Amino acid sequence: MKREEIAEARDRLAHQLPNPAQIVRGSLLRRTIRHRRGCPKCQAGGGHLVWVLTVTYRGGKTRQFSLRPEQRAQVRQWVRNYQRLKRHLEAICELNHQLLWPAE
């Protein structure tokens, strides 16, 4: 690939980056909460469905954010945006590495 083509490919990727204000790192998980006693639904084996955003930090510390049902779609999109941003940044870095090679 020629240097001009590499630069154009990099610029195309840069224009496709999602809005950084609409990203979140983590995993969206569905969990079932069961109360130990006093809840007929839990005693029947059903439990309560909840959605959480799980984020693992440096050092192995994990944090979970409980989500309201109306937040699920937004958080799912933000997680996808983060994954897309990460993929695009890696691709841009690879193209920039190629631009650092001596011209042939």
Regions picked out by a protein language model, each given a short descriptive name:
Residues 1-104:
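A positively charged, amphipathic N-terminal helix/segment that binds anionic biomolecules
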